Curated annotation (Swiss-Prot):
Residues that bind (6S)-5,6,7,8-tetrahydrofolate: 117-120
Matches recorded under Pfam families: Formyl_trans_C, Formyl_trans_N
Top class in the EC scheme: transferase
The organism's place on the tree of life at top rank: Bacteria
Keywords: Protein biosynthesis, Transferase
Catalysed reactions, as listed in the record: L-methionyl-tRNA(fMet) + (6R)-10-formyltetrahydrofolate = N-formyl-L-methionyl-tRNA(fMet) + (6S)-5,6,7,8-tetrahydrofolate + H(+)
Source species of the chain: Acidovorax ebreus (strain TPSY)
EC number(s) per entry: 2.1.2.9
Function (record text): Attaches a formyl group to the free amino group of methionyl-tRNA(fMet). The formyl group appears to play a dual role in the initiator identity of N-formylmethionyl-tRNA by promoting its recognition by IF2 and preventing the misappropriation of this tRNA by the elongation apparatus.
Lineage of the organism: Bacteria, Pseudomonadati, Pseudomonadota, Betaproteobacteria, Burkholderiales
Family to which this protein belongs: Belongs to the Fmt family.
InterPro entries assigned: Fmt (IPR005794), Formyl_trans_C (IPR005793), Formyl_trans_C_sf (IPR037022), Formyl_transf_N (IPR002376), Formyl_transf_N_sf (IPR036477), Formyl_transferase-like_C_sf (IPR011034), GART_AS (IPR001555), Met-tRNA-FMT_C (IPR044135)
Designated name of the protein: Methionyl-tRNA formyltransferase
Length: 323
């Protein structure tokens, strides 16, 4: 079976590697254009492009696939490459470009998407972050037959995984990437013998995982500790849950909900205790959060005890207050 692969980040690279290991022929890879990255802001190829080049696979990096859009020459060149590949199917994983109908129609078996949620819950750009942020007990991967809608196509395969209280977006991402790679191989093997049975998504339970905005990273200490703790986990590694002390920026990478209720006369964001277990901070609804791993601007992630050696804090100080 000839497979065109369209994807960009690490999540997609894992799936591409699994397809190649399973013996599928991949004549063409589509991925986002190289972007500036790192401290030197040098152009950097996506993980998928790096993988493709290592395996000698042709790579196309169009700015758009819309023939009537802003970059028609890019789209026309991509169309020629896609048609020349004579693929049976296209596999799409976190590609980052909208696929026009002509793309969906070109491969014999259409386009299959690896989506990191249990559809129809968390359609959209950030399903892993949003599942953790919402406190979901489980998530998973859905292999979907793509149509013109936003993650609305028929489901082909689905597998669940539990979200543990310790999971961050980083850990859950890695687990789902492996699951997605395994499921897409299974789906293509089933498709080769006509064994896939499309199931329409249910009309109930639709939610949208909107793209993460960096502005969301600011911790609102008026929220209950449980809500803040979920956001800390959801925003690791990006964009990181952030607060301030005066003019100094601080990121919180790990925390624990303290079972001891705080005194209600303490201001939300006020530091109530500092000990070997971390920094106790007053939160909304009379709750208490213990910060255990922190980072100051330009520094490294540090356990609370090490962080405090270079950034002294004291009970009574208020995090997130205007300087």
């Amino acid at each position: 079976m000839r497979v065109i692969f369209a994807g960009t980040p690490e999540f997609a690279r894992v799936a591409l590697e699994r397809l190649l290991t399973a013996g599928f022929t991949v004549p063409l890879v589509l991925t986002q254009p190289d972007r500036p990255a790192g401290r030197g802001m040098k152009l950097q190829a996506s993980p998928v492009k790096q993988c493709a080049l290592q395996h000698g696979i042709a790579v196309a990096q169009p700015l758009s696939l819309r023939l009537d859009g802003k970059y028609p020459e890019d789209a026309a060149a991509a169309k020629a490459a896609i048609e020349a590949a004579q693929a049976d199917v296209m596999v799409v994983a976190a590609y980052g470009l909208i696929l026009p109908q002509w793309v969906l129609n070109t491969p014999r078996l259409g386009c299959l998407n690896i989506h990191a949620s249990l559809l129809p819950r968390w359609r959209g750009a950030a399903p892993i972050h949003r599942a953790i942020e919402a406190g979901d007990a489980e998530t998973g991967v859905t292999i979907m037959q793509m149509d013109a809608g936003l993650d609305t196509g028929d489901m082909l395969l689905l597998e669940k995984t539990a979200i543990s209280p310790a999971d961050t977006t980083a850990t859950l991402h890695d687990r789902l990437a492996q699951l997605g790679g395994r499921l897409i191989v299974e789906a293509l093997e089933m498709a080769a013998c006509g064994g896939l049975k499309p199931t329409p998504q249910p009309a109930e339970g639709v939610t949208y995982a909107h793209k993460i905005d960096k502005a969301e990273s600011t911790i609102d200490w008026n929220q209950p500790a449980e809500v803040i703790a979920r956001r800390v986990r959801a925003f690791d590694p990006f964009p990181g849950a952030a607060t301030t002390l005066g003019a100094d920026a601080i990121k919180v990478w790990s925390c624990e909900i303290d079972s001891c209720s705080r005194t209600l006369d303490a201001a939300c964001g006020q530091i109530l205790s500092i000990d070997a277990d971390g920094i106790g901070v007053a939160c909304g609804a009379g709750s208490l959060l213990r910060l255990t791993v922190l980072q100051r601007a330009g520094g490294k992630r540090l356990p609370a005890a090490d962080f405090l050696r270079g950034f002294p804090l004291a009970p009574g100080m208020v995090l997130g207050a205007a300087p």
